[in-house]
Structure formats: structure tokens, C-alpha cells
Amino acid sequence: MTVLEDIVAGVREDLATREAATPLAVVKEQALARAGAKSAVDVLRREDAIAVIAEVKRSSPSKGALADIADPAGLAADYEAGGASVVSVLTEQRRFGGSLADLDAVRAAVDVPVLRKDFVVSPYQVWEARAHGADLVLLIVAALEQTVLTSLVERVHSLGMTALVEAHDVGEAHRAIDAGARVLGINARNLHTLEVDRATFAEVVGVVPDGVVKVAESGVRGPHDVLEYARAGADAVLVGESLVTQGNPRGAVADLVAAGAHPALRAVRH
């Protein structure tokens, strides 16, 4: 069993428990009672700068425990104050230490769009994301059959949210586009080895249509990586580990945002 398969198996078990406790009909009522989702495409595709998606992330399969985040709302507020365009919240519990309670806390704390980052395999989780205030939902191509991926993209968009569809290679990028992705995440982390190769972004981005927002995921350790991804064609970067493992997340986000707005990138962006 691969790392991804193991994670998804656990996700399905936890999902079954939640479905038994809260039927889909109830979750749908909660979702439809929410105010409309915030638009994410425009904040991720800016003419003047690279957008930063800052992540609330306690642990990961590759590194184990990263940070003891006692106050996810406070961390998210720091991210927003530092200039983050979107806040990402891990809600997978077993490997990443996240929860829907974290999503609730972050949603209440910030005005920027919020991404639910999880291993979504069922429409229930999409409705659940909206019920808890998410504006974007991560969908991982490698975890989904094409018909399921397409159906989930359509469901996310039908609820006014934005699907961030994640690919790891050219083939997955084509699948994401065929499924209707408007925002494509290109993850530099190999799902089998968990190693990061930032060259993956440059290899994949060439097949992505101009109208699709391109998000570079994994491997952002500092401002120089933002510049590298921007020069390769990224519209946004998603950053987690490097923000939660040092003492000044607000300042760290501000540094990444400043790099994304560097004058040297203007010629690249136009």
C-alpha cells in the first residue's frame, strides 16, 4: 500500500464515522444556510504579484510533527496580516493532525478565502467543506478516478466554491484540465518517495492553458523559491512547513509576499 493509499483508507474510515453521526441531508442544510463562498480565482491571479496561500499545518507524513498549533485562528490572523491571499487549513486528522474545528476557527478569524485541504473522495466532504465555511476545496488527481474527479469538481463549483485540483505530473495535469479545473496546483512532492523536486513545476506548467490559475505547491523555503516559481510561470505559491516551523509567521508571510511583488518579476508577468 502506498502512502497515498494508506491515507485515503484512513480518510474513508473517518468519513464513515462522520456520515453516521451527521447525515448528508443535515450537512446540506448547514451548507446552504451559509453565506456565499468568497471568490478565489481573482485573488490568486493578480497582475502585479504572486499570491501566497499560507497553511495551518501541524504535521505531515514526510516530517512528522511540525508545530504545536494551539491557536489556529491566531496563526491564520497572522497570515492574513502578513499579506496572505488565501489561508489553507489541513482537516485530515491521522497524518496531518488537522480537524474541521480548525477550519471553523480559521474561517471565523479571517476575511480572505479559506481552503479546505484534505483527501476528498466523496461529495459528502464537499458539502461538509461549505458547511464549515470553506471557499476552496483541494481535489487530488492521484486519489480519484476520472469520473469521480470530474463529478467532484462540478459539485465544488456548483456550491460556489473553487476546486484547487492537484497534479504531480503532466498526465495528471491533463486529467485536471479535462475535469474542468480552473485552479491547478502543481505539487513538487513525489507521492511515493515524499521527496521534493522543484523542477516538477516547470516540467508540468507548459501543458496548462493560460486561463487556468497555476499554483506551485511544496518546496517553498523562502523568498528565493517564490521568485523561482514565479519565473517558471506560477500565479501563486502554497506554503506550509516553512511558515509553522519558525517563530514569526506574520513576518515570514510578508517576506514571501514581498518577493512575489518584486519589480524583477514584472516583465515575467506581462
UniProtKB/Swiss-Prot annotation:
InterPro entries: Aldolase_TIM, Indole-3-glycerol_P_synth, Indole-3-glycerol_P_synth_dom, Indole-3-GlycerolPSynthase_CS, RibuloseP-bd_barrel. GO terms for biological process: L-tryptophan biosynthetic process. This is Indole-3-glycerol phosphate synthase. Transmembrane segments: none annotated. The lineage of its organism: Bacteria, Bacillati, Actinomycetota, Actinomycetes, Micrococcales. Pathway: Amino-acid biosynthesis; L-tryptophan biosynthesis; L-tryptophan from chorismate: step 4/5. Its EC number is 4.1.1.48. Keywords: Amino-acid biosynthesis, Aromatic amino acid biosynthesis, Decarboxylase, Lyase, Tryptophan biosynthesis. The gene is trpC. It holds the Pfam family IGPS. Belongs to the TrpC family. The keyword Lyase applies. It comes from the Bacteria.
